[in-house]
C-alpha cells in the first residue's frame, strides 16, 4: 500500500479545518480561509493544489451552509472565489520568504485588505444597498470596517499558526522538507 504524500494530507486537513471553521458559529469573517489561501500559494509546490485547497474549502463549506441555513450560495460567489485566487497568487509571491514573520504578517494584512477592497467594491456595484456615488462607495467601505477587523485578525492569527507550524515541520520532519 502506498503512503499518502504528507503535503497532500496537509491539503486535505486544511480543507477540513477551513470547512469546519466556516460552518461552526463564529464572528463574521473570522475564518481561516484567507490564511489558508495565502498559505496554499506559499507552501504547495503544485499550482493546482494551491488553488484547489481554498476553492474546495469554500465550495464544501458554501454547500453545507446552503443545505443547513439557506445562506451558502449568493450572487457574489464568483467575486469571492476570485479574491481568494488573488490571495493564492500573493502566497506564491511570498513563497521564498515563508519563514519570515514580517513577510508572512505583511502577507496576512495584505490578504485581508485585498478581500476587504474587492468584496466591498463588488457589494457596492452589485447591490442596491448603497447609491452609486462616491458617497455610497465610502458608506459601503465604512459599514464593512468591522468585518475587515475580524478578517484581519483571522488572517494574522491563522497565518501565524499555519506558517509557523509548517516551517517548524519542514525543519524537523524530513517528509515535509521541500524537494530540491
Segment roles from a protein language model:
Residues 50-60, 104-112, 179:
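Central hydrophobic cores of alpha-helical transmembrane segments
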Residues 20-31, 57-90:
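Interfacial aromatic-anchored transmembrane helix boundaries in multi-pass membrane proteins
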Residues 33-37, 71-79, 104, 137-141:
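Non-cytosolic membrane-interface motifs at loop->transmembrane helix junctions
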Residues 1-43, 48-49:
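Hydrophobic transmembrane alpha-helices
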Residues 8-13, 48-52, 77-82, 105-109, ...:
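Hydrophobic alpha-helical transmembrane segments
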Residues 1-4, 173-180:
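Short, charged juxtamembrane terminal tails flanking transmembrane helices
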Residues 20-21, 40-47, 86-98, 165-173:
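Structural signal for the C-terminal ends of transmembrane alpha-helices
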Residues 98-171, 176:
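Membrane-embedded alpha-helical hairpins and interfacial helices in multi-pass inner-membrane proteins
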